[in-house]
Regions:
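Juxtamembrane membrane-interface segments at transmembrane alpha-helix termini
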Residues: 190-192
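GST-like fold's C-terminal all-alpha helical module
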Residues: 82-85, 94-188
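GST-like domain detector, emphasizing the conserved glutathione-binding G-site
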Residues: 1-8, 13-124, 128, 138
Length: 193
């Protein structure tokens, strides 16, 4: 299996975390999105959307979109609950991550770290919705160790990378103790150093 990804991307980190935790062998192929490497003809042949992460399996099939890859790799493992309703709850968090968390928390980080904008340059809506997403996550974690069930799951993996890096987007986790404790639990459970 080959993982095409950018180490700086939280979406790519999800796939790496999952493969590492499940001890799935892979070759990492670095694609620097800031240098346009996901827009080359060679890469676009593999993924016409021009996005990472992308996994190419040994049989030549390719799969894009971080949460689809994570969920596929996790099938039959402890990362994906057996109970159909619990599986649906993991999907709920994973969809929420892509529509209500990542577009704000990750984009603020991207603009500050990679586009070298200042906090004052960020759109107020971006900051407000990112903070709201982190508040929603805090509420979802209050009184529980993980997002779904009593062990780490694909839902946690979907939300972990960009939440761990939220400070790079100007978001403060100091007032979100459940989230900070959850990050530490996930790092231990997933053997992230």
């Amino acid at each position: 299996m080959q993982i095409y990804g950018d180490h700086n991307s939280g979406n790519c980190q999800k796939v790496k975390i999952t493969a590492d935790f499940l001890r799935i062998g892979y070759d990492w192929i670095d694609v620097d999105i800031m240098k346009g490497q996901s827009r080359t003809d060679a890469f676009l042949t593999l993924n016409p959307a021009g996005q990472v992460p992308l996994v190419v399996f040994d049989d030549g099939r390719a799969l894009a979109q971080s949460n689809a890859i994570v969920r596929y790799l996790a099938r039959g493992s402890s990362l994906l609950p057996d109970d159909p309703f619990a599986q649906a709850k993991t999907d709920e968090w994973m969809f929420w991550e892509q529509y209500s968390h990542e577009p704000y928390v990750a984009v603020a980080r991207y603009q500050l770290v990679y586009l070298k904008k200042t906090a004052a340059d960020l759109e107020a809506k971006l900051v407000e919705r990112g903070a709201r997403a982190l508040d929603r996550l805090e509420l979802g974690l209050s009184g529980r160790d993980f997002l779904v069930g009593d062990r780490v799951s694909v839902a946690d993996i979907a939300l972990l990378p960009y939440t761990r890096l939220a400070h790079e987007g100007g978001f403060d986790l100091a007032t979100r103790p459940a989230t900070r404790a959850w990050i530490e639990r996930c790092e231990r459970a997933l053997r992230i150093t």
